[in-house]
Regions:
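N-terminal Rossmann NAD(P)H-binding glycine-rich loop of SDR-like oxidoreductase domains
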Residues: 3-27
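Conserved glycine-rich Rossmann-like NAD(P)H-binding loop of the short-chain dehydrogenase/reductase
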Residues: 27-36
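NAD(P)H-binding glycine-rich loop region in Rossmannoid oxidoreductase-like domains
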Residues: 37-39, 43-91
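Conserved Rossmann-fold NAD(P)-dependent oxidoreductase catalytic core, especially the SDR/UDP-sugar
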Residues: 87-143
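Active-site Tyr-X1-5-Lys
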Residues: 134-168, 173
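Glycine/proline-rich active-site loop of Rossmann-fold NAD(P)-dependent oxidoreductases
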Residues: 158, 172-188, 218, 227-238, ...
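A conserved pocket-lining segment of Rossmann-fold NAD(P)-dependent short-chain dehydrogenase/reductase
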Residues: 187-215
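Mid/C-terminal beta-alpha module of Rossmann-like enzyme folds, strongest
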Residues: 220-308, 320-322, 326, 343, ...
């Protein structure tokens, strides 16, 4: 049976990795985003998910069988996050309804399903770790829940199957991405080396000492494709991480070693990147000009607010992947190597020296 993919948010960390895998596996792929880039063997579509008319125009004549929603829009409050991001999912699925071609829809959310939204991140009564998919929703407004509800409603209405994927912090390469820890840390390390500044962990003592995990964008892509093509996995949510665990006190030294730095001891007080990097844009521009880098605007590369939110959590964050493992998903990625692979790509693309 013919299978055609529509990847929504294909220019982001998650969407670009998925698009690459689908093309590699021989799928016809259409990539939809507001500003689609050129990717080999991919048909680009430009549309605004917040504009139903824009979607109707862009999707006219399209016949995707599998839809992968890998994007979201950050707003000033959780109320606005809910309003905007739920509408984006609803608008997309409403626009696709007349095609009658959609057999499966995938939605990527994340661990805020268990931790709560940015407005109430890691606060209140949280489920015990490791997080499992059968743990219920928190009693708090959360745009992930609103997105899921739009997906479930459309699936019941239109008869397609679905999956929800909940990664931890995702590592990958995408310039201008809203949540990009690996690139943020690469830029931070480069600035520290250039200025001779200590390479200081920006997060909480709990994160420094506790076990945790992460998600390589390639690992997430593999799980999305596996679930979308495995009937036993249909109509289910899955956690997805690399398959290993680590402590940041170890990972910080591994990252420092990659950049030829010495990892500083844990600081006497919390040292968020938004504070540490507040005045670094001119330094980065100088580094970029000296080394012939492609992006002199530091703010196009880094997302310190997101890295601070992840590394500043006052609780342990570990994820259970038994559910997908029992159904046959066995992919694995060492988390330190996932960082190194991103750093290597950034160097190859002349984004860091």
């Amino acid at each position: 049976m013919n299978q055609t993919a529509l990847v929504v948010g294909a220019s982001g960390i998650v969407g670009s990795a998925l698009t690459h895998l689908l093309v590699e596996q021989g799928w016809p792929v259409t990539a939809l985003s507001r500003h689609p880039g050129q990717q080999p063997d991919v048909t680009p579509l430009a549309a605004d998910l917040q504009d139903p008319a824009s979607l109707a125009t862009a999707l006219a004549g399209q016949q995707p069988t599998h839809v992968f929603i890998t994007t979201w829009s950050r707003q000033a409050t959780e109320a606005l996050n809910i309003q905007v991001n739920a509408a984006m999912v609803r608008n997309l699925l409403d626009a696709l309804r007349p095609t009658k071609s959609v057999r499966h829809v995938t939605l990527v959310t994340g661990l805020k399903h268990y931790l709560g939204p940015f407005d109430a991140y890691g606060k209140g009564q949280l489920p015990h770790t490791p997080f499992r998919e059968d743990q219920g929703r928190l009693d708090v407004e959360n745009f992930y829940y609103a997105q899921e509800d739009e997906l479930f409603s459309a699936a019941e209405r239109d008869g397609f199957t679905w999956n929800v994927h909940r990664p931890h912090t995702v590592t990958g390469v995408a310039v201008g991405n809203a949540m990009n820890m690996a690139t943020t840390l690469a830029v931070y390390a480069t600035v520290c080396k250039h200025l001779g500044r200590p390479f200081v962990f920006p997060g909480s003592r709990v994160q420094w000492d506790s076990l945790t995990d992460m998600t390589d964008a390639r690992q997430l892509a593999q799980q999305q494709l596996w679930a979308a093509t495995t009937p036993a996995a249909f109509d289910q949510a899955f956690n997805v991480t690399n398959g290993d665990v680590f402590r940041w006190k170890w990972m910080w030294s591994r990252i420092a070693e990659y950049f030829g730095l010495e990892a500083a001891d844990y600081p006497a007080q919390l040292s968020p990147l938004e504070t540490q990097m507040a005045d670094d844009a001119p330094t980065w521009r100088q580094i970029a000009e000296t080394n012939g880098l492609q992006e002199p605007d530091m703010n196009r590369l880094v997302s310190p607010w997101h890295t601070d939110a992840d590394l500043g959590r006052p609780i342990e964050v570990v994820t259970d992947m038994s559910k997908s493992r029992r159904l046959g998903f066995t992919a694995y990625q060492a988390s330190d190597q996932a960082f190194f692979d991103v750093f290597d790509q950034l160097r190859a693309q002349r984004l860091i020296p």
